[in-house]
Amino acid sequence: MYGIIYPKTTNLEITDNMDTIILDHQLQETLVFPDPSFPIQYYVDDLHQWAGRQVPLHWHFGYEFFSAVSQDIEVQVGNEQLMLLKGESILITGGQLHSYRLTSPQEPCLCPNIVFSDNVLAPLTSTVFQKYLRHILNDSALPCTIISGQEDWQREISECLFRIYGIFTAEGNLCDTAPDHAPVKSMHSDCPEIDVHLNLFEIFKILYCHRSELHHIKISRPDQKTQIRLQKMLHYIQTRYPEKLTLE
């Protein structure tokens, strides 16, 4: 899923074995789901396949669950610098700038994740979305939520999430990753779409019931625009001035 391709005018070179993602001039990734009627996709990202062993800042309108199964992962969401410990997962809501960086170059770093739109849960105008889901997915003070497993309800969420990963693994819906590299045990389902839907709903039911325990922060739009400009400036410097810069 990941890697980075800037517009053709940037002169960025990409090796054949690098994972790629198409971003526009605002660092937005345009999501295209294989099945628009069931808009959810499963990926396993190997952060070793990235330049600098990191997924650069980008954003998209879909929601994302990302899990650290092999090692701790440095995560940036907006201005927040977070450490996702091995065994933890993070939910990042739509429209948030985010990036990932591995911490142990010598260790494997396969990270299962899912990206999905609100339509896979419920229509935006439905009672279910307006009464329950929007409090988690559309709260500007809740750009991300770490699922640490320290509490029983967090462990329940992790179990639901990894059941979803397992169902997709069993179905062979593993984007850009060889089956023998799958970091999650496959889980057969006679009704995979229904089971994925049920587990997603259970996750958000739990989050809603424990919403008062979630860590709320504020990420403003001006901050996001500033980060986009800074990221583009750094990319310009890195590609046009490969020599070490000094103040002399």
Predicted regions: what is each one?
Residues M1-L91, G95-Q96, Q130-K131, A141, ...:
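Generic protein-terminus/edge-of-domain signal
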Residues L57, L82, P105-Q106, Q224:
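A short beta-turn/loop motif at secondary-structure boundaries
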Residues G78-N79, L102-S104, C191:
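Short, solvent-exposed loop/turn segments at secondary-structure boundaries
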Residues G95-N119, T127-V128:
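Ligand-binding loop in jelly-roll beta-barrel domains
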Residues D118, L161, L200:
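Short amphipathic alpha-helical/adjacent loop interface patches that line ligand
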Residues D118-L142:
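Double-stranded beta-helix
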Residues P143-R155, Y165-E248:
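Short, Lys/Arg-enriched, Trp-marked, Pro/Gly-tolerant hinge/linker segments that flank
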